[in-house]
Amino acid sequence: MSNINVIDILKESDALLEGHFLLSSGRHSNRYCQCAKLLQCPQKSEKVISVIAEKLKEVDFNIIVGPAMGGVIVSYELARQTNKPGIFAERKEGVMCIRRGFEIKKGDKVIISEDVVTTGKSSLEVAKVIEEMGGEVVGIACIVDRRAEDVKTNYPIYSACKLEIETYEKDNCELCKKNIPFVKPGSREQK
């Protein structure tokens, strides 16, 4: 599996975008990774997610939870490859929760699956729900880890690749200063 070049597959899938983007975190960036473009291709997704599955071989877990939207397909494919159950969390009235008959049992060891981790906000929201239900989060699995060095999640990250993409506060964004309109590609509602 080590001969898989995840960045090349992301590029082939048109998942790495250039422009001016308002991220779901509220920060701005000149690059964006739209993993939905990768995830629409099952064969490419299978290859990329196999890199994560390989990293999870030595991790003790029994269930995978993916936050909607980006983590749903990742959860499914990772569950398929690791032969573990895969479920998803979703927002109800703006609050992340486990619904649809899914459950986390006391003592479950959980991997949270994501497409992209930037600030870890969605993962941490899901972790809180899992822990309130009696589960233990043992890691976060993602296709792309694009966290800045100062962003900590308190959980190990198992990613298919690491991308260093600069982000900016609105007030420090050169693209805003040039009046270049932004695109809001993320799935979380902006306030």
From Swiss-Prot:
Catalytic activity entry: orotidine 5'-phosphate + diphosphate = orotate + 5-phospho-alpha-D-ribose 1-diphosphate
Pathway in which the depicted protein is active: Pyrimidine metabolism; UMP biosynthesis via de novo pathway; UMP from orotate: step 1/2
InterPro entries on file: OPRT, Orotate_PRibTrfase_bac, PRibTrfase_dom, PRTase-like
EC number annotated for this UniProt entry: 2.4.2.10
Swiss-Prot/TrEMBL keywords: Glycosyltransferase, Magnesium, Pyrimidine biosynthesis, Transferase
Pfam families: Pribosyltran
Binding positions (orotate): 118, 146
One Gene Ontology term from the biological process aspect of the record: 'de novo' UMP biosynthetic process
Residues reported in the UniProt entry to bind 5-phospho-alpha-D-ribose 1-diphosphate: 114-122
GO terms of molecular function: magnesium ion binding; orotate phosphoribosyltransferase activity
Cofactor dependency: Mg(2+)
Subunit and partners: Homodimer.
Stated role: Catalyzes the transfer of a ribosyl phosphate group from 5-phosphoribose 1-diphosphate to orotate, leading to the formation of orotidine monophosphate (OMP).
Family: Belongs to the purine/pyrimidine phosphoribosyltransferase family. PyrE subfamily.
Protein name, UniProt field: Orotate phosphoribosyltransferase
